[in-house]
Amino acid sequence: MTRNSYLKALLVMAMVLFLASCHRDEDAPRLSLKQQQTFSHAIAGSYSGSYAVVYTDSLTTYEKVHEVQPDGSVKEMVAHNAHSETVADARLLITDDGKLYFHNFPCRLLAKIVDVDADLSQALSEFGSIDVTAQYKFFYENTEFVGWSFEPLNLPLTLNYRNERHYIRIAFSNANRFYRFPMKDLESGSFHFESETALQVEAIYEGEQLLQSFTSFDGLGNSMLITFK
């Protein structure tokens, strides 16, 4: 076989695999629009609770370990001198149009991990509470359970320090967490939201400029995990 023939054969094989993959995706079970609407109505509501906040900063030290977790994953780092705080009177609002609101999020907590700029940190410590908005979606998991996840939107803040107005943006993630709910409860209307819902602080920007990025809780560096429970 010539080199050109070999390359053509590889190209054809790659196309076949690509088309087969697309075909499998098209055949995968999906939730209907009616199901998604039913599930959104079932999950919608206002839920009272508290924020359990865990964070690491410059005082935190780390130890390498090899611990097998119940889910089979391996934990390779343990944080010492991490900090925790509980914020009462928190509220989670879930609407039936795909929105999720973490009410009364205390921005002062961000000052505990932002150390790139002392004036910025001070301004955050004096800022009041604000709502963090997210968008959620359902996805098919199996005939018994429905998957659910959300994506936090950037949180815009206008702060005044050094005699100037600064347009700050906080980026969050869902801490790579996914949730599963019994399909029969969502369909019957007997569902009650009881999941511990987590936000992880990812980065802080001024405009498009990255000021400071943060790690996951078991990583090296400043981090913050906020769990509504």
Residue ranges and their predicted role:
Residues T2-L11, V16-S46, K229:
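Bacterial Sec-dependent N-terminal signal peptides
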Residues P29, A171-N174, F178, D185-K229:
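Edge beta-strand at a domain terminus
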Residues L33, Q37, E63-G72, V78-K112, ...:
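Mature soluble binding/inhibitory domains
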Residues S40-V65:
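Tryptophan-anchored aromatic micro-motifs
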Residues G49, F102-H103, F193-S195:
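Short hydrophobic/aromatic-rich beta-strand segments that constitute the beta-sheet cores
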Residues V54-T60, R108-V116, L199-S216:
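Short, cysteine-centered beta-strand-loop-beta hairpins and adjacent loop/turn segments enriched
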Residues H66-V78, A82-S84, D115-F145, T215-L220, ...:
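A short, surface-exposed beta-strand/turn
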Residues A88, L92-L186:
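Predominantly extracellular/secreted and cell-surface proteins with exposed
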